[in-house]
């Protein structure tokens, strides 16, 4: 895919940069030695003039290495910090990271005019060029409430009705995808797992956000999936070039990587039709109302300044990107963990069978506590993001310990490093499926799950029980007032994907030792080419 081509060439550039870096280090070391041994003098003026720029070049190359080594650089800096705030240099700015909840809460409490989530997101996604000229303000006021109310109240409340339809669609989708894989022996088929998961998340989200018609439109779904990839490519290129080139280059790239435009045009037609349907209902025509995010956003649109078609489409595209991107990579990592720990699979199958999908639907997807704990432990050890609570500094900001951050830089927390801290987590580097399960729930599960014993599967420490959607000890969903309001839907959708896969199919990795992830900046992505063996179960 085009992303692989881009990353391959970026890797070649990094190799060339590495060679330059070695030469730069050697020369800057010479400069350091001159200054240390002789100090500045007239005799050294020539060397200072020649070599001083190389010190700057060395720093820039080190910052560029963050592109492909971001998580490792953050981890190394975290281990040296002893709990204090620490900083890492990136090609565009400095990131100041914190790793304790006191300072994380200080980030959350800061005014949005000082530390801005939207300004950081705008820098990452370049929405003016990737999302059809969507202009974000650095500070969102009350006009952002329609989307928040839609996701937190309307979508979460509709889950008991929505989840059975999503599961039905996904069962059909997985069967179709299985048929397209190459058969290797006796009904066993082989293929790449990530495209399957990405397609499942896209279809699920399209149903919830846009309604069943667009969710079953292959052309729309293809554009929606490509839009994720194209957004990342365009935004990353624009972040790497001087701002004076961003407008012409952004137009050039978006005209060629045009899946965002295809998606925008389809959503514009759909939202426009919804407005016409509303007018017709006012005139007495019997046109049924839809139950999806388009309709609910229209319901909650500000009365004093109603959102029009363009604003609604832009909001839908933004939430589409975030939800598909994060959920697909998270679900894929969980599947990798199931393949690494096949002893967990039968336990989770029995939990799904004992609980039943009907009870799951009625709960809005908020039960299956064993699977919930498995998903949380998977995300703890294999997060797809190294940072959270990401904010761009708009005004000088100081933490309570005196650490100052200047405008243009970012402040973030470091959850990936924090989640492996042995001072916080017992057996921090080990995968324990029941780490987040309450003891009484595990004790009850032993009454209906065969092979489940406290000797074989233990809770490594008391007091860590919590659900996947909790925020008290967890940063996957963001922090405090800026946390993800769609997390109840996302959690339920991932449970359906995992539950359907393990109850209907046997799955294992073709090469369990092959590399599965690569990093770019702070993100960690699964390789799209990782192969699985997949076979339909007899009782499915």
Label each PLM-derived region with a short phrase.
Residues 1-12, 522-540:
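C-terminal helix/juxtamembrane-tail motif
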Residues 65-75, 358-403, 407-423, 464-465:
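Conserved cytochrome P450 K-helix E-x-x-R motif and the immediately C-terminal K′/meander segment
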Residues 90-92, 101-104, 108-191, 195-210:
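Charged/polar low-complexity intrinsically disordered regions
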